[in-house]
Amino acid sequence: MSRSSKKGPYVDIRLLNRIEELNRANEKRVLRTWSRDSTIFPQMVGHTIAVHDGRRHVPVYITENMVGHKLGEFAPTRSFRGHGGKKADKRGKMK
C-alpha cells in the first residue's frame, strides 16, 4: 500500500539537510544512510548515497530516472543462490 497523497513523500530530514549542504558547497561526497524508506528528490540527482542493505552500505548513484522512487529499491537485501540439487551445491556455496 502506498503512502497517502495528502501527506506527501517521505524523506529523512537529516539526509535532505546533508544533501542541501553539499549542494550549497558544490561538493560531491558519498553519504552513508540507513534510511531505505526515503523518497529520492530532485536535489539528490548527481550524488552517490551509500544505502544500508542490512550487512553493508551499497553505493547508489542517483540519476533523474530515479526521482520519486525509494532508496531501498536500489540496494537489494536478499541474494538468491539458486534452488537445491546437486549442481546448486557446487554453485551456491560461499567462498
From Swiss-Prot:
<feature type="compositionally biased region" description="Basic residues">
    <location>
        <begin position="80"/>
        <end position="95"/>
    </location>
</feature>
<keyword id="KW-0699">rRNA-binding</keyword>
<dbReference type="GO" id="GO:0006412">
    <property type="term" value="P:translation"/>
</dbReference>
<dbReference type="GO" id="GO:0003735">
    <property type="term" value="F:structural constituent of ribosome"/>
</dbReference>
<dbReference type="InterPro" id="IPR002222">
    <property type="entry name" value="Ribosomal_uS19"/>
</dbReference>
<dbReference type="GO" id="GO:0000028">
    <property type="term" value="P:ribosomal small subunit assembly"/>
</dbReference>
<dbReference type="Pfam" id="PF00203">
    <property type="entry name" value="Ribosomal_S19"/>
</dbReference>
<dbReference type="InterPro" id="IPR020934">
    <property type="entry name" value="Ribosomal_uS19_CS"/>
</dbReference>
<comment type="similarity">
    <text>Belongs to the universal ribosomal protein uS19 family.</text>
</comment>
<dbReference type="InterPro" id="IPR023575">
    <property type="entry name" value="Ribosomal_uS19_SF"/>
</dbReference>
<dbReference type="GO" id="GO:0005737">
    <property type="term" value="C:cytoplasm"/>
</dbReference>
<keyword id="KW-0689">Ribosomal protein</keyword>
<comment type="function">
    <text>Protein S19 forms a complex with S13 that binds strongly to the 16S ribosomal RNA.</text>
</comment>
<keyword id="KW-0694">RNA-binding</keyword>
<keyword id="KW-0687">Ribonucleoprotein</keyword>
<dbReference type="GO" id="GO:0015935">
    <property type="term" value="C:small ribosomal subunit"/>
</dbReference>
<dbReference type="InterPro" id="IPR005732">
    <property type="entry name" value="Ribosomal_uS19_bac-type"/>
</dbReference>
<dbReference type="GO" id="GO:0019843">
    <property type="term" value="F:rRNA binding"/>
</dbReference>
<protein>
    <recommendedName>
        <fullName>Small ribosomal subunit protein uS19</fullName>
    </recommendedName>
</protein>
<feature type="region of interest" description="Disordered">
    <location>
        <begin position="75"/>
        <end position="95"/>
    </location>
</feature>
